[in-house]
Swiss-Prot record:
Nv1 toxin seems to be encoded by 8 different genes. 4 of them code for identical precursors, whereas 4 others code for very similar precursors. In the genome draft, 6 additional loci are also correlated to Nv1 toxin, but they are not predicted to be functional genes. This high similarity may be explained by concerted evolution. The primary structure of the mature peptide is identical in 9 entries (AC B1NWS4, AC B1NWS1, AC B1NWR6, AC P0CH90, AC P0CH46, AC B1NWS8, AC A7SCE5, AC B1NWR7 and AC P0CH45). Additional information can be found in entry AC B1NWS4. Disulfide bonds join 42-82, 44-72, 65-83. Residues 1-20 form the signal peptide. This is N.vectensis toxin 1 7. It comes from Nematostella vectensis (Starlet sea anemone). Expressed in ectodermal glands and in clumps outside of the extodermal layer. Is not expressed in nematocytes. In adult female tissues, shows similar expression levels in mesenteries (gametes-producing tissue), tentacles, pharynx and physa. GO terms for cellular component: extracellular region.
């Protein structure tokens, strides 16, 4: 009887997962806008040497810069890059 209950619960979970609706997909333009507004600001080399007065025109991306973005900091980091469009 216990194994029957386990089978019923597993089937119910399988149906719940299989019938889940996916979120509406954003267009590429909407996705680019949301990506550009997300993240931690960073100072590019063009912002100047003083971090306190810099405009922080870059955004930190984990890994490497996505397509359409370029690395704007001269030093190399394994974990993240400072990128701007």
């Amino acid at each position: 009887m216990t194994s029957f209950k386990i089978v019923i619960v597993c089937l119910a979970l399988l149906v719940a997962v299989a019938s889940a609706r996916s979120r509406d997909m954003m267009s590429d333009d909407e996705r680019d806008y949301h990506f550009s507004k997300r993240g931690i600001p960073c100072a590019c080399d063009s912002d100047g040497p003083d971090i306190r007065s810099a405009s922080l025109s870059g955004i930190v991306w984990m890994g490497s810069c996505p397509s359409g973005w370029k690395k704007c900091k001269s030093y190399y980091s394994i974990v993240a890059d400072c990128c701007n469009q």
